[in-house]
Amino acid sequence: MILNCPHFQQQDCVSCQWLEKPYATQLTDKEIDLKRLISPFILQNFTEILPPVQSSQKQFRNKAKMVVSGSVERPILGILKDQTDPQSGIDLCDCPLYPTEFEALFPILKDFIARAGLVPYNISKKKGELKYILITQSRYNQSIMLRFVLKSEQKRPLVERELPNLLAKLPKDSVVSLNIQPQHAAILEGETEIFLTEKTTIEENFNDIPLFIRPQGFFQTNPNVASQLYATAQNWIKDLAIQQFWDLFCGVGGFGLHCAKALQEKNENVQLTGIEISASAIASATKSAEQLQLKNITFASLDSAQFALNEKSATPDLVIVNPPRRGIGKPLAEFLNQLGTPYLIYSSCNARTMAQDFEALSNYSLQKVQLFDMFPHTSHYEVLTFLVKKS
């Protein structure tokens, strides 16, 4: 076994379903899967399949999603082995995927739970307050975003009373919030976010690009591999004749900002339009662009497919898409196929739906493919592709 994980050995936690596979075998199996899915689009003497980007095999995650069970005096942070049994809590504070700094953080959180009287939510009795603790770390400055998911605001005064003591033990520039999730259901978070700190974002930095992480927003879980993913996209397009481009499903702007920075070093008039449904992600992307002092950048909170289908301005020279697992979908794929932009970058966490989208992109040839092992010890992976319009 690659990692010594007693939880896997005892079959208490099987999230890392490939833990018994040697790492080289994991990568080979992922490459075989990817090539099988995209084989209809691989062109001899044209499509370049680059070697996979490897991950660290431990301590690569920047976040933890901990179910809280046990008692207020002795909370258990980890998972429920049986979702319907509150007594089935498994403590995962020693999970080898977490950064080393989390080791010191978990005892601080357990102490805080007791001091603030945050009784763990009991799913069978429908009683208690604290459901989850969600933690994200910045690799850049080690600051922490700490979110307590509660059933109600009832314990807020006690939390605020104990907060100064907690903040004194957290890294500088950390963010603490309460997320209110009143439903009796296995839903990770609710809509209401109450910030207990002045700061509402933690700053990450990939390749000298500041990126701001907010609650309820998507951010890659493997920062070392993610930074290489963005740098690769930047490298692929930096010498192309691009005057304007779109970044669809842009999140906090990782792809668009990397590409805009490289392109504007040669031509400051290059224009970027970034589109993302999440308003908080767009606020983060806008903040990054301002900090980088980039010009001609527009980020807007819209549905990516609706934006593209209704946009009447000039055809962009490049479109970047980084959709969720479901892919970009047939209507958007067919639209992009007719739009005729010279270059497409498609980044995907689900090669199966990406391959389905490629079927509709019949006017394009697949020029480059690279696998990024964002999720070691599982069957999942990220893939970056570069497509060019057929002449």
UniProtKB/Swiss-Prot annotation:
EC number: 2.1.1.189
Reaction(s) catalysed by this chain's protein: uridine(747) in 23S rRNA + S-adenosyl-L-methionine = 5-methyluridine(747) in 23S rRNA + S-adenosyl-L-homocysteine + H(+)
EC supergroup of this enzyme: transferase
Residues at the active site: 349
Key words of the record: 4Fe-4S, Iron, Iron-sulfur, Metal-binding, Methyltransferase, rRNA processing, S-adenosyl-L-methionine, Transferase
Binding site for S-adenosyl-L-methionine: 220, 249, 276, 322
Domain of life: Bacteria
GO BP terms: rRNA base methylation
SUPFAM superfamilies from the UniProt entry: S-adenosyl-L-methionine-dependent methyltransferases
Job of this protein: Catalyzes the formation of 5-methyl-uridine at position 747 (m5U747) in 23S rRNA.
Sequence similarity: Belongs to the class I-like SAM-binding methyltransferase superfamily. RNA M5U methyltransferase family. RlmC subfamily.
Protein name: 23S rRNA (uracil(747)-C(5))-methyltransferase RlmC
Organism the protein comes from: Actinobacillus pleuropneumoniae serotype 5b (strain L20)
